[in-house]
Design a protein with these regions (language model features):
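Glyoxalase I/VOC metalloenzyme domain signal
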Residues: 1-14, 22-75, 82, 87-161, ...
Length: 222
C-alpha cells in the first residue's frame, strides 16, 4: 500500500523486523517485529497506526514536563545499539514519542536503521510532501479530555470547531494545532443523536485511536 502511494523503502532496522518508508518529509515505520508493542497493538486493534512522534527541542525535558503534568510513561524495550526514545501514553494507548534528533546524519533513522544500498534516501515519490494532519476518533464525551491533553502537555490550541448534523447522525470536531502550526490534530466524537461513522470506527477499532492520516501535496489530482 505504501509503495502504491509513492513511498520507497529506504532503510531497515539494525536488529528488528522494522522498515522505514519515506516520501518527501514523511517517514512511515512499518513494524513487523513479533512480540512487540506493535504486534500486541495490532492484535487488539487490527492494522493501524500504533504510535506517532513529535519533534521537540529537548526530548528529555519535554518528557519530564509531561510526566509532571500527569502524562503516563510508556516503556518500550530497546535492543543493543538502539536509541531509548522517551514516550508517553497517547490516544488509544499508542506511544507518543518525543524526538529531538533530526536532520541529515543525526536523526534517529541514521542511528537505529541501515539505509539500503542504491536507494535514494530522499525520494520525491508521487509528490506527497509532509503530514498535513492526523485525526483522532474518540468516545462521546471524551473530546474535551483529549483537547485538554494536548493543550496542557504541549500548548496546543483550538483553531476550529465543527458541529455537523445529518438527518440521522452527526458529529462534533475540534481541530487542535501545535504552537508552530506544524502539528494538526482534529478530534472527532459522535453527536448525541445516534450511531454514525465515529461509532462505527470505535467498534471496529476496539477503542479510540488515529482514524486517518492526511498528506500534503502541491497537486492533488496528479
Amino acid at each position: 500500500v505504501f509503495e502504491m502511494m509513492g513511498f520507497t523503502k529506504v532503510a531497515v532496522h539494525r536488529s528488528k523486523k522494522v522498515s522505514l518508508y519515506r516520501q518527501g518529509e514523511i517517514n512511515l515505520i512499518l513494524n513487523e517485529e513479533p512480540k512487540s508493542h506493535a504486534a500486541y497493538f495490532a492484535a487488539e486493534h487490527g492494522p493501524s497506526a500504533c504510535g506517532m512522534a513529535f519533534r521537540v527541542r529537548d526530548a528529555q525535558k519535554a518528557y519530564e514536563r509531561a510526566l509532571e503534568l500527569g502524562a503516563q510513561p510508556v516503556d518500550i524495550p530497546t535492543g543493543p545499539m538502539e536509541l531509548r526514545l522517551p514516550a508517553i501514553k497517547g490516544i488509544g494507548g499508542a506511544p507518543l514519542y518525543l524526538i529531538d534528533r533530526f536532520g541529515e546524519g543525526n536523526s534517529i533513522y541514521d542511528i537505529d536503521f541501515v539505509y539500503l544500498d542504491g536507494v535514494d534516501r530522499h525520494p520525491v515519490g508521487a509528490g506527497l510532501k509532509e503530514i498535513d494532519h492526523l485525526t483522532h476518533n474518540v468516545y462521546r464525551g471524551r473530546m474535551a479530555y483529549w483537547a485538554q491533553f494536548y493543550e496542557h502537555l504541549f500548548n496546543f490550541r483550538e483553531i476550529r470547531y465543527f458541529d455537523i448534523k445529518g438527518e440521522y447522525t452527526g458529529l462534533t470536531s475540534k481541530a487542535m494545532t501545535a504552537p508552530d502550526g506544524k502539528i494538526r490534530i482534529p478530534l472527532n466524537e459522535e453527536s448525541a443523536k445516534g450511531s454514525g461513522q465515529i461509532e462505527e470506527f470505535l467498534m471496529q477499532f476496539n477503542g479510540e485511536g488515529i482514524q486517518h492520516v492526511a498528506f500534503l501535496t502541491d497537486d492533488l489530482i496528479a
